[in-house]
Amino acid sequence: MAAVVFSLRRSGPVFRLPGVLQVCRGAQTAAAAAPASQAEARIKKFAIYRWDPDKPGDKPRMQTYEVDLNECGSMVLDALIKIKNEMDPTLTFRRSCREGICGSCAMNINGGNTLACTVRIDTNLSKVSKIYPLPHMYVVKDLVPDLSNFYAQYKSIEPYLKKKDESQEGKEQYLQSIEDRDKLDGLYECILCACCSTSCPSYWWNADKYLGPAVLMQAYRWMIDSRDDYTEERLAKLQDPFSLYRCHTIMNCTRTCPKGLNPGKAIAEIKKMMATYKERAASV
């Protein structure tokens, strides 16, 4: 009895005798690709910072792993996930979106603060890729930094719309012109990954007092929002010698930002606003 086999061609069903091997186009493609999987291994070494606070006496160290790039995705985060899934389940790091949106996988890779999900693996097999947690932060475990202080500073600037007349809150929209909305471009895109703040020497030295580039850029974002009524009050909170003025325009923040933003410029704009604010305050 003849069998009915559906072909990938548009000519409809094709009758074939039983026992005759049928090879679909996808199988042919897989067969053609087979030699590639047998290519010579490309072994890449990753030296990763390790420290486990739950192990008494454990000291920070670098642990080396070898990954075949032929069997790994192209990004550093792909390598970390492969290491954790297939070699060492104790390796700890943060990650979520895998597309440069959430900021979770911020770490120091080959000397620069960046996102592991958006940085390609250096394919030079003679070089060891070195991965550390964000610098000058307390470490929770391995590549996980403690961001408690960073988030507390962000909370302190009240990063939300504030209105002095709240009678219409929830009843109508707070409209904004196209021109005023355009002023927020390059500011609202910040994902709070902390790459910029942890690359700033001033923040290393005064993290308990200096707000740092990420938080200051968000402070500026709300200061210039035409819908916000608390610009003067926001400026007043930065009057002390440390919150704002520890910025020495080193510009590491702008160089390292994985989103291509310019926190240094935002801080400079706040300083300009502060000058006019002081003049207004003195005249009162």
UniProtKB/Swiss-Prot annotation:
One of its GO terms (molecular function) is 2 iron, 2 sulfur cluster binding. It catalyses: a quinone + succinate = fumarate + a quinol; (R)-malate + a quinone = enol-oxaloacetate + a quinol; (S)-malate + a quinone = enol-oxaloacetate + a quinol. Residues 44-137 form the 2Fe-2S ferredoxin-type domain. CDD domains: fer2. The keyword Metal-binding applies. Pathway: Carbohydrate metabolism; tricarboxylic acid cycle; fumarate from succinate (eukaryal route): step 1/1. Its cofactor is [2Fe-2S] cluster; [3Fe-4S] cluster; [4Fe-4S] cluster. One of its GO terms (biological process) is tricarboxylic acid cycle. The keyword Mitochondrion applies. Gene3D superfamilies: 3.10.20.30, Alpha-helical ferredoxin. Keywords: 2Fe-2S, 3Fe-4S, 4Fe-4S, Electron transport, Iron, Iron-sulfur, Membrane, Metal-binding, Mitochondrion, Mitochondrion inner membrane, Oxidoreductase, Transit peptide, Transport, Tricarboxylic acid cycle. Residues 1-26 form a transit peptide. It holds the Pfam family Fer2_3. Its main location: mitochondrion. It is found in: Mitochondrion inner membrane. One of its GO terms (cellular component) is mitochondrial inner membrane. Residues 180-210 form the 4Fe-4S ferredoxin-type domain. [2Fe-2S] cluster binds at C97, C102, C105, C117. It comes from the Eukaryota. Its EC number is 1.3.5.1, 1.1.5.-. It is a peripheral membrane protein. [4Fe-4S] cluster binds at C190, C193, C196, C257. Iron-sulfur protein (IP) subunit of the succinate dehydrogenase complex (mitochondrial respiratory chain complex II), responsible for transferring electrons from succinate to ubiquinone (coenzyme Q). SDH also oxidizes malate to the non-canonical enol form of oxaloacetate, enol-oxaloacetate. Enol-oxaloacetate, which is a potent inhibitor of the succinate dehydrogenase activity, is further isomerized into keto-oxaloacetate. Belongs to the succinate dehydrogenase/fumarate reductase iron-sulfur protein family. Component of complex II composed of four subunits: the flavoprotein (FP) sdha, iron-sulfur protein (IP) sdhb, and a cytochrome b composed of sdhc and sdhd. This is Succinate dehydrogenase [ubiquinone] iron-sulfur subunit, mitochondrial. It comes from Xenopus tropicalis (Western clawed frog).
